Amino acid sequence: MHEKRRERGRTYRVGLILGFCLLIAVNGLFPVSCVYAEEEQTKIAYGENTPGQLYARSAVLMDADSGRILFAKNAETERPMASTTKIMTCILALERADPDESVSVSANAAAQPRVRLGTVEGQKFKLKDLLYSLMLESHNDTAVMLAEHLAGSVEQFADEMNQKARELGLSHTHFVTPNGLDGADDGGSHRTTAEELARIMRYCVMESPKRKEFLEITGVSSYQFSDLEQTQTYSCINHNAFLTMMEGAISGKTGFTGEAGYCYVGALKREKRTFIV
């Protein structure tokens, strides 16, 4: 009897993995690299009761409550992380600044490549509004605006991101940019692993003192705001398709660069359990 229950549970867990893989394959959303998580008591290696082809180059399953890794495929391989970087940018902004602070646009921020909010030097915005721009539309100029506001420069903010990574015990993660554009510095390339990216998301949704605010921002379908001078209104649409496609999805961030490929990290709740996706 107990063996049958365990087998049903295992089938459910593998089914969850298959479900995500099917969504990814059919919809073409994130075919290259993504992070999954779900509750289990024993670690499942890739190839053991898993789909014959898991198209992600790296993937993990994690129990979000305990942080236990339950499924892994190349989970410790260092790779660029594209715009999934912005979950760290967002949580640092929430933890270290007042949401009503005024943020100015520098020439450097305004010159960032697409995708961007489309700001001009000298514009001012409320910090809270920029966090929706960052997480829903993944605007690169917004990430630089926040980095410069919080730390004075992109380079100094990268140092603060790396300090936070060390506090979280992440030894294979290195930040160079606040927006996830590919880059390198004296510490090496902009990179993380599937496991460590999942741990960053776990911190954002489970452990941070600003987790409620993080979930509020990343869980909405759309948001509208204006600059402080009321000269222009901006509309943001959440591009995390899993919020509507997957029951229980509560947060997530997409990403893409030529070097990173397609990336995804997210969180969902099922039957009172929290998973990292």
Label every model-predicted segment.
Residues 1-11:
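N-terminal Lys/Arg-rich, disordered targeting/topogenic segments
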Residues 10-25:
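Sec-dependent N-terminal signal peptides
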Residues 71-92, 102-103, 125-133:
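Short active-site loop at a secondary-structure junction
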Residues 41-54, 153-276:
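Penicillin-recognizing serine hydrolase domain
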